[in-house]
Design a protein with these regions (language model features):
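Bacterial N-terminal signal peptides
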Residues: 5-15
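Electrostatic cytochrome c docking/interface patches
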Residues: 20-44
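Solvent-exposed, polar/charged alpha-helical surfaces in well-ordered, non-transmembrane soluble domains
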Residues: 35-39, 80, 84, 126, ...
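Short pre-active-site segment immediately N-terminal to redox-active cysteine/selenocysteine motifs
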Residues: 44-48, 56, 124
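C-terminal capping alpha-helices of c-type cytochrome domains
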Residues: 101-137
């Protein structure tokens, strides 16, 4: 479990050090599944994205208004930009309130049972990225 976290941390540092705002390489080496990614995005138990974001999900009530609308996300950002924003949004905006969904180091106020564990697995991150890339309108 520590090796994937170290790889993610290294990828984030390399991207920021070189002035990039993206994490171009897949965390798993494979494309994600957009159907699973949509399920994670709208889930009130897993991704919790709709607590802050809204999007093209008419069947979902009580969508957030604190963060950017997810409609058109695949048009506004590249796959790598979306990946970094999910894995470690603090690399883009240190003042963000969005949690780091895959970074496990340097976090504040994490319950003991969750320390060292990412919110989403590498596969789940890739699934969400694949789904967000389908949102072109």
């Amino acid at each position: 479990m520590r090796l994937p976290a170290a790889i993610v941390a290294l990828c984030c540092m390399v991207g920021v050090a070189s002035g990039e705002d993206a994490m171009p390489d897949s965390l798993t080496g494979a494309k994600g599944d957009p159907v699973r990614g949509r399920a994670i995005t709208v889930s009130r138990q897993v991704g919790l994205c709709l607590l802050c974001h809204s999007g093209p999900f008419p069947e979902e009530r009580f969508q957030g208004n604190l963060a950017p609308d997810l409609a058109g996300a695949g048009k506004r950002w590249s796959e790598g930009q979306l990946r970094l924003r999910i894995v470690d949004p603090g690399r883009i905006n240190p003042a963000t309130i969005m949690p780091a969904y895959h970074r496990t180091e340097g976090l504040a106020r994490v319950a003991a049972t969750y320390r060292g564990k990412p919110v989403l697995s590498a596969e789940q991150i890739e699934d969400v990225v694949a789904f967000l890339m389908t949102l072109r309108d």
